[in-house]
């Protein structure tokens, strides 16, 4: 049997609050259309996608909005704009599915993480999600705390 390869992708940015603030539905993997300095800046791991979202334009294209990829320090006059809208690359059928999902009440497209795959390409994991209300967030917190407590009790009793 061949030795099992471990995960080869490197996470550049992660939206950890998304799973707390939203009920995550279907997830998609999309490519990112980036400039050279954006790729180099992403590799430093200082990008922020916590306040970002994706939207489908009338032309049938999907854009990542409000994501911050800081300027690359070694690039001088050829640097990029940190908060520009970035095009996401998906199949047309997937874009149609996302557009139909956002037309439903309360659904939005949320980025979960940006990573580099095993071929060195920048990819983004996006999800169709519905925003949680305050009581749902409290319920999630209670369940997580109870699961932790159960784990502690099971370890103590052995």
UniProtKB/Swiss-Prot annotation:
User: Where in or outside the cell is it found?
Assistant: Cytoplasm
Q: Which InterPro entries match?
A: SmpB, SsrA-bd_prot, SsrA-bd_prot_CS
For the keyword RNA-binding, the answer is: yes
Q: Which domain of life is it from?
A: Bacteria
SUPFAM superfamilies, alphabetized = Small protein B (SmpB)
* Keywords from the named record: Cytoplasm, RNA-binding
List cellular component terms (GO).
cytosol
The biological process GO terms on file are: trans-translation
Q: Which GO terms describe its molecular function?
A: RNA binding
**UniProt-listed Pfam families:** SmpB (PF01668)
Principal location class: cytoplasm
Family membership noted in the UniProt record: Belongs to the SmpB family.
Which PANTHER family does the entry link to?
Answer: SSRA-BINDING PROTEIN, TMRNA-BINDING COMPONENT OF TRANS-TRANSLATION TAGGING COMPLEX
Q: What does this protein do?
A: Required for rescue of stalled ribosomes mediated by trans-translation. Binds to transfer-messenger RNA (tmRNA), required for stable association of tmRNA with ribosomes. tmRNA and SmpB together mimic tRNA shape, replacing the anticodon stem-loop with SmpB. tmRNA is encoded by the ssrA gene; the 2 termini fold to resemble tRNA(Ala) and it encodes a 'tag peptide', a short internal open reading frame. During trans-translation Ala-aminoacylated tmRNA acts like a tRNA, entering the A-site of stalled ribosomes, displacing the stalled mRNA.
Protein name, per record: SsrA-binding protein
